[in-house]
């Protein structure tokens, strides 16, 4: 999923927090920053004024303006022109410093947004870098029901009619929490972290065949829903195989694997759906098993080792 942000959107999102005021270059409010073309390149998303490797949002503090003032008139003009030619998303002056007229004129002429803020440079840098990194982070929508089970994020997937929503409803009645139904959105906010959220349109809602759309917050209370959760496990519901497996190894280890989501391999446990099986209990057990494995405890490996030791002791 492609993500982007315009200068106007960034200004509106951070105006109150950073006290931003628009000083010049308002014609460039539609200037856009796209994730695919910026995140992997050398320039930072936000940083102090850099004319060699220009940042996407250039911050001008007292030292940067003093450096510009120390330049010869022609060199100063060439430097300002070079800054504008790099097409930054915006320029931000710290501590409400008076904006130099030549900088203001260049911003208006080139359509480069120029903002003023009462904040210090490091505050602007921290807030803008974090906000842009989150906004432009890689993201994907996966079909399924995303829940918090035993304090970890679990995505329940499966074909249409496999019982995902019914399973989610039973898990809710057992005290677990809903994050998103049908179309949870996952954002890679760190190299090993996928943050799952619910689209605004679907918040608090769960669709169950025969019942229609249910408002989980109204039915189960505020504690039954959660705004976001990190994805740690995928439980996939599938129809049982018609042919027997060629070996019994899966009877020991279960049907476990991984699913590649963005840049991460997420642990995957597959549960066959058959009449009479309590999927809620099985999903809870799968979650507990995953928690044990993250602690280095693998019951199947322990049994295999115990069995091997027993055979060795009985071998003459």
Swiss-Prot record:
Required co-factors: Mg(2+)
The protein's name: HPr kinase/phosphorylase
GO molecular function, one term: magnesium ion binding
Superkingdom of the source species: Bacteria
Keyword Protein biosynthesis: no
Stretch list, region Important for the catalytic mechanism of dephosphorylation: 272-277
Other noteworthy facts: Both phosphorylation and phosphorolysis are carried out by the same active site and suggest a common mechanism for both reactions.
Free-text function comment from the UniProt entry: Catalyzes the ATP- as well as the pyrophosphate-dependent phosphorylation of a specific serine residue in HPr, a phosphocarrier protein of the phosphoenolpyruvate-dependent sugar phosphotransferase system (PTS). HprK/P also catalyzes the pyrophosphate-producing, inorganic phosphate-dependent dephosphorylation (phosphorolysis) of seryl-phosphorylated HPr (P-Ser-HPr).
Organism: Stenotrophomonas maltophilia (strain R551-3)
GO terms of biological process kind: regulation of carbohydrate metabolic process
């Amino acid at each position: 999923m492609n993500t982007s942000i315009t200068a106007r959107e960034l200004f509106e999102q951070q105006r109150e927090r950073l006290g931003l005021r628009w000083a010049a270059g308002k014609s460039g409010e539609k200037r856009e920053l796209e994730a695919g073309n910026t995140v992997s390149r050398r320039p930072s998303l936000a940083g102090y004024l850099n004319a060699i490797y220009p940042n996407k949002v250039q911050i001008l503090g007292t030292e940067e303006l003093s450096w510009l003032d120390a330049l010869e008139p022609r060199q100063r003009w060439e430097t300002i022109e070079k800054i504008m030619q790099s097409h930054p998303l915006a320029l931000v002056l710290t501590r409400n410093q008076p904006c130099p007229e030549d900088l203001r004129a260049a911003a208006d002429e080139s359509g480069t947004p120029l903002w003023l803020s009462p904040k210090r440079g490091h505050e602007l840098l921290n807030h803008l870098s974090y906000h842009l990194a989150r906004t432009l982070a890689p993201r994907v929508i996966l079909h399924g029901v995303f829940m918090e089970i035993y304090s970890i994020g679990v995505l329940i997937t499966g074909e249409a009619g496999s019982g995902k929503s019914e399973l989610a409803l039973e898990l809710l009645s057992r005290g677990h929490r809903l994050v998103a139904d049908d179309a949870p959105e996952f954002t890679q906010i760190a190299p090993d972290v996928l943050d799952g959220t619910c689209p605004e349109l679907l918040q608090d809602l769960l669709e169950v065949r025969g019942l229609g759309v249910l408002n989980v917050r109204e039915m189960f209370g505020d504690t039954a829903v959660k705004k976001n959760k990190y994805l740690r496990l995928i439980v996939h519901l599938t129809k049982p195989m018609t042919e027997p497996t060629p070996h019994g190894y899966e009877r020991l280890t279960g049907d476990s694997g991984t699913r590649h989501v963005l840049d991460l391999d997420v642990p995957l446990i597959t549960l066959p759906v058959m009449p009479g099986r309590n999927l809620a209990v099985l999903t809870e057990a799968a979650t507990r098993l995953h928690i044990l494995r993250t602690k280095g405890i693998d019951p199947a490996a322990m049994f295999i080792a115990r069995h091997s030791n027993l055979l060795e002791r009985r071998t003459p």
